[in-house]
Amino acid sequence: MQGLNPFHRDQGAGGRPAPVRPAPARPAPVAPRTPRKDPAPSRLAYRLNRMMLRPLVRRLVHVGLPAFLAALVAGIWLSDDTRRANLTGGIDAIVDRIQHRDEFMVKMMTIEGASPVVDKGLRAMLPVELPASSFEIDLEKLRERVLKLDAVETVDLRIKPGGVLSAVVTERVPVVLWRHARGIELLDKTGHRVASVTSREVRGDLPIIAGEGADRAAPEALALIDAAGPILPRLRGLERMGERRWDVVLDHGQRIKLPEDKALQALERAIALNGALHMLDRDISVVDLRQEARPVVRLGLEAQNAIRQARGQPELGPDGTPLAPEATAGNAAKAKKKSG
């Protein structure tokens, strides 16, 4: 058969080489196609995602649930009495060691401006004995207790470096004595009680006021005493009448009854009258100024009896009742004997 082919195997027409034809390539194996996932979520996932968009649900999941689990675990762990006692004891021991460190200890107390009685009372009010931890001393409560002392007006408490508890005390200054049914007490300028005394001679340098409610009107009483001026040497005190007004008590049993209002102005008028007329040097027992438009003067017993004798009337006794004629004659004889 080769002889029948005028061309060579490798030659084409005209003696040219025949083109080489590549063998067809075998197709590559095709991998099995995986089914595509449906991008749409399920109803449950959709609802969960929508719920997580709510702030309350997010906080509940991120904070509430972990906190609940932690509390549950802690509660189970602390349900055992032994573990709970050990934990409490350990915490108390740590706190005690910290509070009793040397830098927190108060070793001494200094008090300034207090009398010996107040100094002793203030030291007795300390809740603990020194040295003690500063955590055991509540300065605010201690200050409230100290201020309950009648003699203390103010107190400044502080813990200074070096473990020193400092107390600077300002005591009340007594300026007047107050006599009442329960005894005699010292009052300051505001009428606050300072201390009790057994008799007026303990503080004879102070003026005295008397009567129920006089302590509440002490500032007014002090103003009246300051205004007494010329009659101050004769002043024995002020008496509160009916918790409404004052009576100025002088020696020889004389009284100046002051009104409920404008008592200071009324006393100044009485002093002016006395300076002009020497009214209080006469036998007058009461000067009644309760009515501004109509002052009243009450004569003393001797002046009244002298007038009654001139009129031929029986004399009056100390209680204001007329005496018998015999007693009147006896008194007249005694008076004549004295004058002779």
From Swiss-Prot:
Species for this entry: Paracoccus denitrificans (strain Pd 1222)
Entry's Gene Ontology BP terms: cell septum assembly; FtsZ-dependent cytokinesis
HAMAP family with a match to the protein in the record: FtsQ_subfam
UniProt domain POTRA: residue ranges: 104-172
One Pfam family this sequence matches: FtsQ_DivIB_C
Residue ranges of the TM segments: 56-78
Membrane topology, record value: Single-pass type II membrane protein
Periplasmic side: 79-340
Biased composition annotated in UniProt, kind: Low complexity: 324-333
One annotated Gene Ontology cellular component of this protein: cell division site
Protein's name in the database: Cell division protein FtsQ
Ranges for region Disordered: 1-41, 308-340
Amino acid composition bias (Pro residues), ranges on this chain: 19-32
Gene: ftsQ
Domain of life: Bacteria
Function: Essential cell division protein.
Similarity annotation: Belongs to the FtsQ/DivIB family. FtsQ subfamily.
Keyword annotations from UniProtKB, A to Z: Cell cycle, Cell division, Cell inner membrane, Cell membrane, Membrane, Transmembrane, Transmembrane helix
First-listed, main subcellular location of the protein, grouped into a coarse class: membrane
Stretches in topological domain Cytoplasmic: 1-55
Location in the cell: Cell inner membrane
